[in-house]
């Protein structure tokens, strides 16, 4: 017989305590599961557990999750987010450069049922994304960081993409999914002598 691993809520969850000076033997007052005071409270009737947390995070009126997610995907496609400080959406982070666009994309993302492919499709089919990345010296001087989104995204490729491109150009890229790993440098052509050193 096979066992299926599942999680189940306990009848009496363990209490958590404020620990005085961080020492586990010096318990302070008991604390219950709740959201931070600066954020909206759990929905009425939501359980105070992981399910309640998930429902709270994905509620359509939650101010952060959809915006942070959209900003991260925008950053991956454009090289920088609509909010430049993507790791800090709080009061110490920067304000969005296009708040209406961020709100609209976040709303569309929630309305699509949190469909990441639909979000990507919306962004990459936009006129902003499909612009040429070339610009004149004058445009570069006026807007070096492309804050105005007047040209297409241009950012560095990650190492994996560079490797795949090098393998594709050399004819060594295997497009089949799965299988044994391929070391592109083991090909016999890789070891041809291309010059002779004078000793």
Q: Where do the PLM segments sit?
A:
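Primarily short, surface-exposed interaction patches in extracytoplasmic proteins
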Residues: 1-198
């Amino acid at each position: 017989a096979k066992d299926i691993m599942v999680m189940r809520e306990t009848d009496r969850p363990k209490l958590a305590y404020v620990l005085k000076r961080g020492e586990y033997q010096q318990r302070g007052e008991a604390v219950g599961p709740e959201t931070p005071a600066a954020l909206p409270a759990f929905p009425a009737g939501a359980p105070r557990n992981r399910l309640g947390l998930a429902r709270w995070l994905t509620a359509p009126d939650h101010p952060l999750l959809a915006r942070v997610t959209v900003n991260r995907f925008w950053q991956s496609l454009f090289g920088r987010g609509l909010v430049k400080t993507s790791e800090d959406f709080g009061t110490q982070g920067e304000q969005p450069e296009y708040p209406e666009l961020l709100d609209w994309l976040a709303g569309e993302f929630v309305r699509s049922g949190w469909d990441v492919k639909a979000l990507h499709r919306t962004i990459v089919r936009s006129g902003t994304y499909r612009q040429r990345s070339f610009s004149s010296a004058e445009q570069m001087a006026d807007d070096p960081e492309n804050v105005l989104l007047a040209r297409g995204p241009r950012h560095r490729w990650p190492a994996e993409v560079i490797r795949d491109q090098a393998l594709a150009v050399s004819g060594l890229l295997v497009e089949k999914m799965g299988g044994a790993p391929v070391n592109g440098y083991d090909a016999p052509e890789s070891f041809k002598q291309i010059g002779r050193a004078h000793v």
